[in-house]
Design a protein with these regions (language model features):
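Histidine-acidic metal/acid-base catalytic patches
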Residues: 2-43, 48-71, 187, 195, ...
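Active-site acidic/histidine proton-transfer and metal-coordination neighborhood
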Residues: 13, 20-23, 97-107, 115-228
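Charged helix-capping and loop-helix junction motifs
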Residues: 58-61, 90-93, 122, 126-129, ...
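Residue-level detector of anion-binding/catalytic polar loops
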Residues: 74-75, 104, 142, 199, ...
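Conserved beta-strand positions in the central sheet of alpha/beta enzyme cores
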Residues: 77, 107-109, 145, 201, ...
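Short catalytic-loop micro-motif centered on adjacent basic/acidic residues
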Residues: 77-81, 200-204, 230-232, 289-291
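Glycine-rich, proline-tolerant flexible connector loops at the mouths of alpha/beta enzymes
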Residues: 77-95, 151-155
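Metal-dependent catalytic neighborhoods of phosphoester/phosphodiester hydrolases
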Residues: 86-92, 119-122, 299-301
Length: 315
């Protein structure tokens, strides 16, 4: 297995490392990996074609794959809650259709929640996550987005967004306890992920993962090559570039938000050339997955978004 760039110095033996670098300038030896000559591959999440409040059948996954291929994307990230079926025949049909169109199924976006004082609820979400890993493996998808979950004290998601993603813990509990639950729960999933060959990507997605510091607290506590970061450019509402830079070395998949027509909850003016420079400096070579979250029709907004990302992430 190729060692992750952030773990090289940590796991290399001191003698072997010093011997291997003898006669080499340290600044050259410790350079991050560079991106491929053609730049990062650009994919699209099926979320980009799916309306928030519409029925799943509005955009079946196979139609998203076909439309993504027609638009010129390299791959597709599948949103689980958009799938019409979890039957194996359906999974293999999606895999076959992607192969026919020359498309990678490169990401699987799932939901779970571990911020719950009830151990039985947390275990139920652990088993759910393991099941989702099995689905990703069956489709040959190499990485899966996971969440910490949240306290739920904000009520609806709209209320959470009005509070800029910030919510207090349940009465009688603390965020520190919540982190302990999340670390224990996700930590119990990584061996299954390793067995199935699916790298988990913890997203900066509200809850205890709202900040880069929160995500890093979990990643570093578990310390597994099978738990990395799914980095969402649109989920840092304060100091976005500083926080993106903190998580860039851990990133296995980047989700890139665009907001043509205005966002549903907010609109961010993201500087993608700057973001691409941050990711290049960290040695990120993985997929950039478009998540279009605006009110404009995907038929026009998604191709425009692809052009922006191609331009920014080309070598």
């Amino acid at each position: 297995m190729t060692m992750h760039r952030r773990n090289f110095l940590k796991h290399a033996g001191a003698g072997g490392l010093l011997g291997g670098l003898a006669g080499m300038a340290p600044i050259e030896a410790l350079k991050p990996l560079t991106t491929p000559a053609a730049g990062n591959r650009i994919g699209v999440s099926t979320y980009s074609f799916w309306r928030f409040d519409g029925p799943k059948e509005n955009y079946p996954i196979e139609q998203c794959i076909e439309q993504a291929a027609d638009m010129g994307f390299d791959g597709v990230e599948i949103l689980l809650i958009q799938m019409g079926s979890e039957e194996n025949a359906h999974l293999q049909m999606l895999k076959r259709r992607a192969i026919e169109l020359g498309m990678d199924l490169m990401g699987f976006s799932t939901h779970q929640g571990f911020v719950d004082p009830d151990p039985a609820e947390r275990m139920e979400n652990v088993e759910l996550t393991k099941h989702q890993i099995d689905l990703a493996s069956a489709m040959g998808i190499p990485t899966m987005r996971i969440n910490t979950g949240r306290w739920g004290t904000s009520g609806s998601f709209n209320e959470l967004m009005e509070n800029r993603g910030i919510e207090p813990p349940l009465e009688g509990y603390t965020d520190d306890e919540g982190f302990e639950w999340v670390i224990e729960a996700i930590g119990s999933c990584v061996d299954h992920a390793a067995e199935k060959g699916v790298v988990l990507g913890l997203e900066n997605h509200w809850g205890l993962g709202r900040t880069a510091e929160g995500v890093l607290r979990i990643i570093e506590a578990i310390d597994s090559p099978w738990l990395q970061v799914t980095l969402d450019t649109g989920n840092f509402l304060e100091d976005p570039y500083d926080q993106l830079e903190m998580l860039a070395p851990y990133t296995v998949l980047m989700q890139a938000k665009t907001y043509y027509g205005g966002g549903t909850w907010y609109t961010l003016d993201l500087d993608y050339p700057r973001i691409a420079d941050i990711m290049r400096d960290a040695g990120f070579r993985g997929y950039v997955s478009l998540e279009f979250e605006g009110k404009e029709s995907p038929d026009t907004a998604v191709p425009k978004s692809l052009a922006v990302l191609r331009d920014a992430f080309s070598a």
